[in-house]
């Protein structure tokens, strides 16, 4: 890792987790976020309040960092569902402004967080590998896929596209229509109903946040690594199975409110993770039941 350090664009759930991981390994880390100074940051992490659309600010930050990890995106699959203009304005447009600021720095190494849960749509077979066609069903997935296409104009040896699955764990904010595990745990703790969209047989790949940050840290430490990488656990869990796991962890029966399936929702997605296994000597270490237990304890301690 270069002494020039790592710039993380986006200080949300994943950006903060990555900053803590990399700083804990002794790397110099800066985080750019619109409200970076609102939350305390440990020593060794320089928090900068600002937006990626600020060309002058981005220019100054990029000049002092050799590696950039881009985690900022203004939509979720639910928030931009059926709203392509919102996806363009809140998701893709700010990213393109960042990419414009990056143009004078072709030597910068960029790791971009795409979306393994949405860009593939419903693939023909599972698990889905990185060379499968991109066929998103949602506006959010289309925005991420478009960003990936723009990145093909960058030097390929300095560009990594990361396609994470459904990441969960301590630190995840409660957002409507996003983060099923946190929502289920909150519903169980507060005796609130959980809205289940569709038949509950939707298959998802869930990755614990510490396993995610470990994978990204390993890639940043391998300067030869480039290209596209799926980041997941490599196994599928249905929503009904997830409900059962949360009920077993909490000892409470969830009250389910059945809702019609939503247009644009992926039905089945499990990621093939052989490429990241080989490139970074990485494998997920956290069982889903254990990750749910750790998340429940964190929620109880931070209620």
Q: What is each PLM-predicted segment?
A:
Residues 6-10:
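Conserved N-terminal Rossmann-fold NAD(P)-binding element of oxidoreductases
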Residues 52-90:
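NAD(P)H-binding glycine-rich loop region in Rossmannoid oxidoreductase-like domains
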Residues 67-68, 81-111:
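NAD(P)-cofactor binding segment of oxidoreductase domains
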Residues 96-137:
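Conserved Rossmann-fold NAD(P)-dependent oxidoreductase catalytic core, especially the SDR/UDP-sugar
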């Amino acid at each position: 890792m270069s002494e020039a350090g790592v710039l993380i664009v986006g200080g949300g759930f994943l950006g903060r987790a990555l900053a803590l991981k990399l700083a804990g390994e002794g790397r110099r880390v800066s985080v750019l976020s619109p409200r970076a100074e609102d939350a305390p940051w440990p020593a060794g992490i320089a928090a900068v309040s600002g937006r990626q659309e600020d060309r002058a600010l981005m220019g100054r930050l990029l000049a002092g960092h050799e590696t950039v990890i881009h985690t900022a995106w203004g939509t979720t699959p639910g928030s931009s569902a059926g709203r392509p203009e919102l996806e363009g304005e809140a998701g893709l447009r700010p990213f393109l402004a960042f990419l414009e600021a990056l143009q004078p720095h072709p030597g910068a190494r960029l790791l971009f967080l795409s979306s393994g849960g949405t860009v593939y749509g419903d693939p023909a077979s599972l698990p889905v590998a990185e060379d499968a066609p991109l066929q998103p069903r949602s506006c959010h997935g289309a925005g991420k896929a478009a960003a990936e296409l723009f990145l093909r104009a960058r030097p390929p040896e300095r560009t990594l596209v990361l396609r994470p699955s459904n990441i969960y764990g301590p630190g995840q904010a409660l957002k409507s229509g996003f983060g099923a595990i946190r929502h289920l745990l909150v519903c169980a703790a507060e005796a609130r109903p959980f809205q289940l969209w569709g038949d509950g047989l939707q298959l998802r790949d869930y990755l614990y946040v510490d396993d995610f940050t470990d994978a990204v840290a390993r890639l940043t430490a391998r300067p030869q690594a480039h290209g596209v990488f799926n980041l997941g656990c490599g196994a599928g869990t249905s929503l009904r199975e997830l409900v059962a796991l949360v009920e077993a962890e909490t000892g409470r029966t969830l009250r389910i409110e059945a809702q019609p399936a939503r247009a644009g929702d992926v039905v089945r997605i499990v990621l093939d993770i052989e490429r990241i296994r080989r490139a970074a000597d990485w494998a997920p270490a956290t069982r889903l039941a254990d990750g749910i237990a750790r998340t429940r304890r964190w929620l109880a301690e931070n209620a």
